[in-house]
Amino acid sequence: DSPLFLYDQLSVSWNSNADLRNSDAGSRAASVNYSIPFGYWTLFAGASKSRYRQTVAGFDEPIVYGGTSKQVEAGVSVVPYRGASYKGTAMLKFLRKRANSTLNDIDIEVQRRDVVGYEFSYGHRHYIDQMVLDVGGGVRGTLPQFSDQPGYVYGDPDWNGRSTILTANAGLYLPFKVAGQQMAYQVNWQIQHAKTPIVPADYFTIGNRYAVRGFDGQMTLAAEDGWTLRNDLSLDLGELLRAPGHQGYAGLDVGRVGGPSAMWLSGRTLAGAVIGLRGRAALPGAANAVSASYDVSAGWPLQKPESLKTASPVFAATLMFEF
């Protein structure tokens, strides 16, 4: 919504795993965000709260890792340059995060965190005919001089609370036609490298619906460094369904983690496949004021450590409403 009628935007969201009555597994999250543009600049602020519980593949046996977090943030973004076929975007924000963690249902006192941090990112988008190319990078970290409880790094009791994480990403979207049918290929690559010791909450995690699909997310691989490669091949179903905005798709993902803590994992690489249906439509009788988007899929693990247990196939569904 636009409460001040200044092209500002207020959004409120809540999400959960499908088993709403099971408070011992999965995740819950809620957030509120507000932004207001001024020319090529945009000011934004937000707050969020989340709870999660997952099983991580350990060296000898699975580890049940969980926790809660609360975060407030504010920042600014700017479009430093733009042209008919390209655009650049830069963003800087500061945040305060409070979190606690549990290991096998036991509170980890040394992992209680109350930290102040920052994040800077830069992205460039380029249009080449119908192809869209995205590249970007960023850095995020903590400001220990303003933090009450920076957390604890295993094996480094003298850690000063300062962390620095470098990130990079690249993406390609390529639409094309086969026998008159509209199709598209999309690939996205992401990488993280920790320049300093970091707490487990900042590890790069793979094996869920966001990073290497085909796994149920109850057991994951996580370490200081990592990368993922996500591939999607989609088919426009608008003509077949006589309604625009719907796609069938197939995906193939691979990811790998690394860093000092990866030596304790039973494996470092995951690969998975997924097929699904996604789309967006205005709800009937709502005068286009309410729209719904959905994504339903089935996935399968293709490569994993033997000790990492997951359902197969993995069914996932997402339903979102916009007012």
Over which residues does each language-model region extend?
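Acidic, glycine-rich active-site loops and adjacent beta-strand->loop/helix elements
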Residues: 16-20, 49-51, 255, 298-302
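Short glycine/serine/proline-enriched coil/turn segments at secondary-structure junctions
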Residues: 4-6, 21-24, 83-84, 129, ...
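Short, glycine/acidic-rich beta->alpha junctions
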Residues: 24-26, 68, 114, 269
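Outer-membrane beta-barrel initiation region
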Residues: 1-46, 82
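Surface-exposed coil loops of outer-membrane beta-barrel proteins
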Residues: 25, 53-67, 206-224
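Residue-level detector of the transmembrane beta-barrel scaffold of outer-membrane proteins
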Residues: 9-13, 33, 42-46, 73-75, ...
